[in-house]
Amino acid sequence: MATRNMIMVVPEEYGFNEHGLMTAVPNSVEEKSYLNLYMHHDGYPEWQGVQLANWRLANPTMDIARASAKLVRDMYYDSSYLYPSVNSIDHQYTYIVWVGKENNKISCFDRYNSKHIFTMTPNEIKTKYADDMDYTDFAKGETRCRRNNTIAKEELATYLSLIHI
């Protein structure tokens, strides 16, 4: 069974108080989210949490609109969809990628158990959850859909052979 998840991208000022403590849950920042990206598979922290940590380390600073667009580009695969609201579709895990001047944190919530799992920096997530898995190497330009340029070249060669070029 798929472990469905939703990724939100939210400005940091809506999630933390003046002491840097998180004060938000997904429903409280729903209207401030620039992105609600549904991912049908692998939502558990050991995969999606680490994937997002790796992505954030490769993309540490950018404005929120650009971060949202790039996250969709880099995370897209054939079972991912954009929704108008975090509550538009059933999913177990909700991730919030916080974007701002001071914050590089990611939060994870388990909706089925009404539980806050973590709010951590990317390195803290990797330390706690990384396992021996074939994570996407965003720092080397990989995306979830295209793991390396060799695949793209092989696909191109296949298409070209079909049209006899």
Residue ranges with predicted function:
Residues 1-4, 31-32:
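Short, well-ordered loop/turn elements at secondary-structure boundaries
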Residues 5-9:
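Short beta-strand scaffold segments in enzyme catalytic cores
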Residues 10-15, 29-31, 98-102:
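Short acidic-glycine loop/turn motifs at beta-strand connectors
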Residues 20-47, 113-114:
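Short, solvent-exposed aromatic-acidic interface loops
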Residues 44-80:
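Compact, glycine/acidic-enriched structural inserts
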Residues 69-118, 122, 131:
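A basic- and aromatic-enriched beta-loop-alpha substructure that forms the phosphate/nucleotide-
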Residues 143, 148-151, 155, 159:
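Extended, charged low-complexity segments
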Residues 163-165:
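Conserved small/polar residues in nucleotide/adenosyl-binding loops
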